[in-house]
Structure formats: C-alpha cells, structure tokens
Amino acid sequence: QKSNQVVIVTIPESKIQLVGLVTRESLEELPYFESEMVAVYVPMSYMVGGYTIFIPRSLIRPINMSVEEAMKNSLLAWLTKTEKKRKP
C-alpha cells in the first residue's frame, strides 16, 4: 500500500479542495466499498485530529509535496509560504 502520497481532494459540485494523504490505494478486500475508492487522511489544523475519507480515485490529484511538508503546513493552518517546486 502506498501511504506517502500527498494529494488534493476535490469535493464534488463545489470549489472546495483539501490536502490529504493517501493511506490506502486499494479497498478491494473490503466488500462495502466500490472498487475505485481510495482512503485519504485529511488532517485538521493544530493536529487535533483529522478525517479518513473514502473517495473515488477520480476526485484526487497527486501533488509534488512531501508528507512532512504537508503535515507541517496543516499544523500551521497554511499560514507560512511554501517553497514552489518546479518540474525539471
């Protein structure tokens, strides 16, 4: 299971986007989820908790950000500027 991918989660029928961490790429062995679903952990600011959401793969987009950077920014409620990473 790939659990180190930072993603943008798009909420259907809105312009809301969240940053989350893929915690489970496949839910096939869990019969109550559709096959295209993935598990994404969405941390809350100040690390008081977070939500694990099960969402269709089509609603997530991987981004070039480390888990450490995503968690740090979440902890600080995205108040600090992040360094832009350019593709080579």
Language-model features, listed with the residues they occupy:
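Terminal membrane-proximal soluble interaction domains of membrane-associated proteins
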Residues: K2-P88
